[in-house]
Amino acid sequence: MVEYILLIISTALINNFVLVKFLGLCPFMGVSKKVETAIGMGMATTFVLTVASLSAYLVETYLLIPLEAEFLRTLVFILVIAVIVQLTEMIVHKTSSALYRLLGIYLPLITTNCAVLGVALLNVNLSNNLVQSVLYGFGAAAGFSLVLVLFSALRERLVAADVPRAFQGASIALITAGLMSLAFMGFTGLVKI
């Protein structure tokens, strides 16, 4: 049980996919202008990442390995992720049309979010079992959501701040992301396995 909790903590905080592995930067920079949008995107990505990790494990274990078709892994994972994202998009559209409009193009773009595919491929490469795969996906999603919400809150404050003209826009956003990455480096050494 402790091993699973440490897996979630290390994936979310220490080996954060956005700040350490630099995966998922497109939605990180694109959807992080408002906290409400970031929370919605975080919830959608959490669902997709967790289910994609489970699905990737099942497809790898019960389809690709028995058929000796591991060379199709990336293509099959992309197709599985696309199906999961379409399901998520339909659920969000039916449950919250306001959130659906706020997320706009970024909801279907979860399909091409490299963090989703990266987590699925890393799960296979790390030889995680079923529970570890799901928790790894959930931890990665929790870390992504945490960083996305924190970054969007910082960006909302930057709008009201007196930022020099040369640093306005993407420049100050990248500097802020770099400072967040430095802050998350403080978690290094938190989990000893």
Curated annotation (Swiss-Prot):
<dbReference type="Pfam" id="PF02508">
    <property type="entry name" value="Rnf-Nqr"/>
</dbReference>
<comment type="subunit">
    <text>The complex is composed of six subunits: RnfA, RnfB, RnfC, RnfD, RnfE and RnfG.</text>
</comment>
<keyword id="KW-1003">Cell membrane</keyword>
<comment type="similarity">
    <text>Belongs to the NqrDE/RnfAE family.</text>
</comment>
<dbReference type="GO" id="GO:0005886">
    <property type="term" value="C:plasma membrane"/>
</dbReference>
<dbReference type="InterPro" id="IPR003667">
    <property type="entry name" value="NqrDE/RnfAE"/>
</dbReference>
<comment type="function">
    <text>Part of a membrane-bound complex that couples electron transfer with translocation of ions across the membrane.</text>
</comment>
<feature type="transmembrane region" description="Helical">
    <location>
        <begin position="102"/>
        <end position="122"/>
    </location>
</feature>
<feature type="transmembrane region" description="Helical">
    <location>
        <begin position="39"/>
        <end position="59"/>
    </location>
</feature>
<feature type="transmembrane region" description="Helical">
    <location>
        <begin position="5"/>
        <end position="25"/>
    </location>
</feature>
<keyword id="KW-0249">Electron transport</keyword>
<keyword id="KW-0813">Transport</keyword>
<dbReference type="InterPro" id="IPR050133">
    <property type="entry name" value="NqrDE/RnfAE_oxidrdctase"/>
</dbReference>
<dbReference type="GO" id="GO:0022900">
    <property type="term" value="P:electron transport chain"/>
</dbReference>
<dbReference type="InterPro" id="IPR011293">
    <property type="entry name" value="Ion_transpt_RnfA/RsxA"/>
</dbReference>
<keyword id="KW-0472">Membrane</keyword>
<keyword id="KW-1133">Transmembrane helix</keyword>
<feature type="transmembrane region" description="Helical">
    <location>
        <begin position="134"/>
        <end position="154"/>
    </location>
</feature>
<keyword id="KW-1278">Translocase</keyword>
<protein>
    <recommendedName>
        <fullName>Ion-translocating oxidoreductase complex subunit A</fullName>
        <ecNumber>7.-.-.-</ecNumber>
    </recommendedName>
</protein>
<feature type="transmembrane region" description="Helical">
    <location>
        <begin position="171"/>
        <end position="191"/>
    </location>
</feature>
<feature type="transmembrane region" description="Helical">
    <location>
        <begin position="65"/>
        <end position="85"/>
    </location>
</feature>
<keyword id="KW-0997">Cell inner membrane</keyword>
<keyword id="KW-0812">Transmembrane</keyword>
